Swiss-Prot record:
Keyword DNA repair assigned: no
Entry keywords, A to Z: Electron transport, Heme, Iron, Metal-binding, Signal, Transport
Post-translational modification remark: Binds 1 heme c group covalently per subunit.
Protein name: Cytochrome c'
Ranges in coiled-coil conformation: none
An annotated GO BP: electron transport chain
Annotated signal sequence range: 1-23
Residues annotated to bind heme c: 35-36, 95, 144, 147-148
The keyword Electron transport is annotated on this UniProt entry: yes
Origin species: Allochromatium vinosum (strain ATCC 17899 / DSM 180 / NBRC 103801 / NCIMB 10441 / D)
Job description of the protein: Cytochrome c' is the most widely occurring bacterial c-type cytochrome. Cytochromes c' are high-spin proteins and the heme has no sixth ligand. Their exact function is not known.
Length: 154
């Protein structure tokens, strides 16, 4: 139970951080670093779910990880793509392609699909049904992939 609470708290911290990024006056470097940290933490939680689906299923771990993913997805990460974050800044590297900033309507559509898939994953994970989680997990992965293929450099 402590793990579930800790993971959820971490996700909620990411939620607050991302949505207040611009208001806090983060530099382009800080915006890039913050969004990368959010995506890295989300990826770690995706890995946790995958490990549970491939091995012994622990419903509490899956639910905690899914809640973190949903919290980050709903955190307003778009605020971390401000002016000057479209390229490497100093020692801070980004893999976002310039096309990302030129196709905001498409990016918004992909983001909404991702948020919906992440929310569904969290809802399904709460049921503890591994097969349903597997399907919802695949949908989240597909949503991630759709953005990565178009807007993330290799």
């Amino acid at each position: 139970m402590k793990h579930v609470l800790a993971s959820t708290a971490a996700g909620l911290m990411a939620l607050g951080l991302a949505s207040s990024a611009i208001a806090a006056g983060l530099s382009p470097e800080e915006q890039i670093e913050t969004r990368q940290a959010g995506y890295e933490f989300m990826g770690w939680n995706m890995g946790k779910i995958k490990a549970n689906l491939e091995g012994e299923y622990n419903a509490a771990q899956v639910e905690a990880a899914a809640n973190v993913i949903a919290a980050i997805a709903n955190s307003g990460m778009g605020a971390l793509y401000g002016p000057g974050t479209d390229k490497n800044v100093g020692d801070v590297k980004t893999r976002v392609k310039p096309e990302f900033f030129q196709n905001m309507e498409d990016v918004g559509k992909i983001a909404r699909e991702f948020v919906g898939a992440a929310n569904t994953l969290a809802e399904v994970a709460a049921t503890g049904e591994a097969e349903a989680v597997k399907t919802a997990f695949g949908d989240v992965g597909a949503a991630c992939k759709s953005c990565h293929e178009k807007y993330r450099a290799k």
